[in-house]
Amino acid sequence: MAHITINQYLQQVCEAIDTRDGASLAELVSFKHPHVANPRLQMASPEEKCQQVLEPPYDEMFAAHLRCTYAVGNHDFIEAYKCQTVIVQSFLRAFQAHKEENWALPVMYAVALDLRIFANNADQQLVKKGKSKVGDMLEKAAELLMGCFRVCASDTRAGIEDSKKRGMLFLVNQLFKIYFKINKLHLCKPLIRAIDSSNLKDDYSTAQRVTYRYYVGRKAMFDSDFKQAEEYLSFAFEHCHRSSQKNKRMVLIYLLPVKMLLGHMPTIELLRKYHLMQFAEVTRAVSEGNLLLLNEALAAHETFFIRCGIFLILEKLKIITYRNLFKKVNSLSSASSRYLLLKTHQLSLDAFLVALKFMQVEDVDIAEVQCILANLIYMGHIKGYISHQHQKLVVSKQNPFPPLSTVC
């Protein structure tokens, strides 16, 4: 395949179309396949050759593909992206003409994937040249992919096996990757609705479902829906291929903060296994209610956490750390009160002030203590109320600090 002639290549294309062999045709138009490195196929003007062998719109599609290999050979990703848009547009015309059949879905997967990759590469080249702002090409690529998605979603006449709807999840995942990259997460919402209401949602491949759950879980995390985030990210982690250590680590980067916000702290063994020791001191700080250590841990690994987009989520752990610190204050106070036969469910606000000063919280006073306690009560982390008259926190006699998993 690396040394075939243009005529042999086009003959293989023709045969794959005639026999409706989607898998073979997908290879012949994919940049994952070795034919793209063949200098005989890297042509600046292949139109005439393609028109001699292929019917429209396949002649236009494969002429654009050969021009694309030529552009990539010259490291011109701006031109490669332009060619890839022509490939997708001409494929879409052919795909729409395939009534009640979906044999070309593998071809759609190949051209859609390459479109996203070339859009990303073109963006980088254009930004370097100062001709575009970040994400412009990706945004245009998303519009094209939405065209493919609409064709798949509107295929209501075909039976389940032959339905183009089977291609919806792959496209949604490609769109998610773009929307996360260009920071337009609100555009994910209608796509999530479409998949969740689909009667095919359990028929997609495990790999596609893992990718889908990973992105929807991340979106739920940013929306502060931590229970859904935990459910979706846990599914992605548990169903990742056993050998995909890198992918499992990627899921954990988002699953760990969610789990911690729900009160489930990771073990040091897990953090070591997936090379995520950046979370070790954060975990210890939250568990111990150690605000000083938490601030130090967040500062020490700030670059990593910001790059992963989780720094602001981890900042939310401060309220959990306050809760755990105040729970310790409550336990110590209750123990001494029982010894002195005093009321164990009333705590002086001064006790919390001392604890916060010990943790080197800056400029803290009783008003700040009341504010933190009011927040914890409002969020359900403490069952009780503040008696301003007596400057005390009055907590419930039963379960004053409910488990975090019942609160978030």
Curated annotation (Swiss-Prot):
Q: Which UniProt keywords apply?
A: Acetylation, Cytoplasm, mRNA transport, Nuclear pore complex, Nucleus, Phosphoprotein, Protein transport, Translocation, Transport
Q: Does Acetylation count among this protein's keywords?
A: yes
Modified residue annotations for N-acetylalanine: 2
Q: Which GO terms describe its molecular function?
A: double-stranded DNA binding; RNA binding
List of residues that carry Phosphoserine: 45
Looking at the record, the residues that make up the PCI domain are 210-400
PROSITE patterns under this entry?
PCI
Q: Which GO terms describe its biological process?
A: negative regulation of gene expression, epigenetic; negative regulation of lymphoid progenitor cell differentiation; poly(A)+ mRNA export from nucleus; post-transcriptional tethering of RNA polymerase II gene DNA at nuclear periphery; protein transport; spleen development; transcription elongation by RNA polymerase II
Chief site of localization: cytoplasm
A Pfam family assignment: PCI
Localization, per the record, is: Cytoplasm; Nucleus, Nuclear pore complex
Gene3D superfamilies registered for this protein in UniProt: Winged helix-like DNA-binding domain superfamily/Winged helix DNA-binding domain
Report which superkingdom the organism of origin falls in. Answer: Eukaryota
Q: GO CC terms on record? A: cytoplasm; nuclear pore nuclear basket; nucleus; transcription export complex 2
Q: Which family does it belong to?
A: Belongs to the CSN12 family.
- What does the record note on quaternary structure? Component of the nuclear pore complex (NPC)-associated TREX-2 complex (transcription and export complex 2), composed of at least GANP, 2 copies of ENY2, PCID2, SEM1/DSS1, and either centrin CETN2 or centrin CETN3. The TREX-2 complex also associates with ALYREF/ALY and with the nucleoporin NUP153. Interacts with BRCA2. Interacts with SRCAP chromatin remodeling complex component ZNHIT1; the interaction results in inhibition of SRCAP complex activity, preventing the deposition of histone variant H2AZ1/H2A.Z to lymphoid fate regulator genes and restricting lymphoid lineage commitment.
Give a short account of what the protein does: Required for B-cell survival through the regulation of the expression of cell-cycle checkpoint MAD2L1 protein during B cell differentiation. As a component of the TREX-2 complex, involved in the export of mRNAs to the cytoplasm through the nuclear pores. Binds and stabilizes BRCA2 and is thus involved in the control of R-loop-associated DNA damage and transcription-associated genomic instability. Blocks the activity of the SRCAP chromatin remodeling complex by interacting with SRCAP complex member ZNHIT1 and inhibiting its interaction with the complex.
Q: What is the protein's name according to its record?
A: PCI domain-containing protein 2
Identify the species of origin: Bos taurus
Classification from the root reads: Eukaryota, Metazoa, Chordata, Craniata, Vertebrata
